[in-house]
């Protein structure tokens, strides 16, 4: 998709619109875990600027508060307090740094082997569909308001011209907000109580994070799913912008930028940040993919974090109004995944491809969740390694069975030597679990000779 060329003024307007898209989720996460919403806005803006600095200003991605860490932050804060928990987020950054170094070391061949189109296509579809539940939950608070904002955005997209056509989301939110006000659904109490200018809470009473090993180690396995989702999001943005960001500036840079942004968020007292699919969906429908526009959104987030009344006004927008907009945005992300499968001519008449796509989608849409212990992780890695080795060696059936039986024997030994149920390491669900399943299936399922030649 070729991006629309805009004047500086129009870039500014669209940039503010993109923040409107990300605002709801960015401030909701800190509210759920007991952090300051204004600080989350500030760290989202700072984190996005760090990301753009590391990626040479080429990748149009906005970083906002990550939902993946809500439960871990709540549990960790009970055990080590919020100061220790924020220091533990450094463990999240470490996972990004290690993945960045691994990708830099192995290069594009590793990514092409782990994430061919038959894997990345359904993962992109899931990024959109997995968010659809959130959109519906927001919209069902008041379906009338949701449909008002949705229909307004659709009418602006299809009938609008000039500048108006570039801001369907703002139009939908503004019209929905006006209707909500007339219906008495908006509470302006916090707007009246908020001061005009104020530093975010964590900055006004800044204190250094208290480093401790236990929360640091606790957060490391939680970061696996966001890292996997990061890879999928970069592929989505590449498809939307019609540029190969995996190659230039490189996935190792995007991964490093995300990790440094998480580190900065912890330092300033905000939640971990992650790539925001909502903004990618907004880019898809507006056809605007300028990185400068995303940086304007980041700057707007920082400005809003210190203007109390503006921040409070945005927080007063009913969830149903935002939900109506999200119904449109998240569906467009899923359509990018379908386009990815079509553009790369993935043959869905092929049994191997059908298995990979169907299992990946079913696990993700069905909401599968697995608990992993240290024992389970080691056994899983061992068995997958045996299957990959057997597939790569192309031995006869007897030798393949012997390799697999050897893996089972070692796994049985590990099962009795290592603790299991009580030593839960992490939980995995959604996109992370589905993506890993797709990667494993792609590695272990044998290809026919004609597929390898293609």
Locations of the language-model features?
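Hydrophobic, membrane-embedded alpha-helices of multi-pass small-molecule transporters
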Residues: 12-22, 145-149, 167-168, 200-234, ...
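Short, non-helical or kinked segments that cap or interrupt transmembrane helices
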Residues: 35-41, 57-69, 111-120, 165-170, ...
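Interfacial segments of multi-pass membrane proteins
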Residues: 72-80, 157, 279-294, 300-304
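Membrane-embedded alpha-helical modules
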Residues: 79-190, 298, 303-452
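Intrinsically disordered, low-complexity non-transmembrane regions of multi-pass membrane transporters
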Residues: 1-13, 188-203, 239-246, 253-254, ...
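Juxtamembrane interface elements at the cytosolic ends of transmembrane helices
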Residues: 24-27, 151-156, 167, 187, ...
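Membrane-embedded helical hairpins/re-entrant loop segments and their flanking transmembrane helices
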Residues: 2-9, 34-52, 58, 220-291, ...
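N-terminal signal-anchor module of multipass membrane proteins
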Residues: 1-61, 68-79
